[in-house]
Amino acid sequence: KQYLPLLLLADPCEAMIDRYLEAGDMHVLSIGDAPVCVAVVTPYSDTACELKNLATDPQFQKQGYATRLMETLFKFYAARFQAMYVGTAGPGVAFYARFGFTHSHTVTGFFTDNYPEPLYEDGVLLTDMLYLKKELA
């Protein structure tokens, strides 16, 4: 929970974070003792994992830290899984597409059904979760 402030940047619902933290692995990229970027990855199936949270401290954004962490995650999880999924909303698709993620499926109403408050990203109300997939092997 020491990284909760960073995790909340990517997912504003602490109850949701608690759920996937229990099932997942936390990865932290730090500069010295200061955490800069965090990620949580959980099993998705026997052959795939899911990136549940990826967040970078605002003062370190747009400097390549999330990219470095993602590349490390791909190498680490390629030994255990064939693919990685990530659930995101519209604004996040372009970021993940840079790494070779492509659309897998959509969960209609995910954000409105699972979050107590409406979620907005770049002024847009989030409703559906877009699942993207990347082959790791």
Residue ranges and their predicted role:
Residues 76-90:
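Conserved GNAT acetyl-CoA-binding A-motif
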Residues 83-87, 97, 102-129:
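Conserved catalytic-core motifs of GNAT/GCN5-like acyltransferases
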Residues 60, 64-72:
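Conserved acetyl-CoA pyrophosphate-binding loop and the N-cap/start of the following alpha-helix
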Residues 24-26, 126-132:
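Short hydrophobic/aromatic beta-strand or adjacent loop that forms the aromatic wall/cage
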Residues 1-16, 28-30:
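Short amphipathic alpha-helix that is part of the acyltransferase structural core
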Residues 28, 34-43, 47-55:
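Conserved beta-strand in the GNAT
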Residues 17-22:
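Short loop/turn motifs at secondary-structure junctions and domain boundaries
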